[in-house]
């Protein structure tokens, strides 16, 4: 209940600010801040019950039809990623790239990002908590109609993690 109240207050405070941003008179129908904030609020509520422990992430990743999605850059993905993950770099997420990569919107998708790991900073450079790639990826997938998305929750030491990692960089 506290989360819902906080979410409602956030929306009530942020949406008017976002709407006021268009007072400049510079219209762009391809950019919709109020719509983004609305979808982000919906996605935030949806996400709360979909954050996984390391053990649940591993178990679910082994189930047929599950896709592990790494939305980091292709370069960082090639340096080190969770075994079995596919790469679709966040800036490249579009209707068409999702249609090619994840044609069935009901596919179970597991996501992770830089902020899930310590001990391999060159491959998983930490972002500010409010700019975590998990947040952006979750909201983006939700915006495109993907609702069967789960997120690796904890911060893990890569050297102690039970996840298997692979590299394609030859380093």
Each language-model region and where it sits:
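Bacterial N-terminal signal peptides
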Residues: 7-15
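A short, well-structured juxtamembrane/interface segment
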Residues: 46-60
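Short Gly/charged-rich anion-binding patches and loops
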Residues: 56, 72, 136
């Amino acid at each position: 209940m506290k989360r819902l109240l906080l979410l409602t207050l956030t929306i009530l405070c942020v949406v008017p600010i976002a709407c006021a941003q268009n007072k400049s008179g510079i219209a762009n129908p391809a950019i919709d801040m109020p719509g983004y904030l609305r979808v982000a609020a919906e996605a935030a509520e949806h996400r709360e019950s979909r954050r996984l422990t390391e053990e649940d992430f591993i178990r679910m990743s082994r189930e047929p039809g599950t896709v592990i999605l790494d939305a980091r850059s292709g370069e960082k993905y090639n340096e080190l990623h969770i075994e079995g993950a596919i790469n679709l770099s966040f800036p490249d997420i579009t209707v068409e790239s999702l249609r090619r990569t994840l044609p069935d919107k009901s596919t179970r998708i597991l996501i992770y990002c830089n902020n899930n790991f310590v001990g391999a900073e060159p491959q998983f450079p930490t972002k500010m908590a409010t700019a975590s790639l998990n947040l952006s990826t979750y909201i983006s997938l939700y915006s495109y109609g993907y609702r069967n998305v789960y997120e690796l929750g904890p911060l893990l030491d890569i050297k102690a993690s039970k996840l298997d990692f692979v590299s394609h960089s030859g380093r």
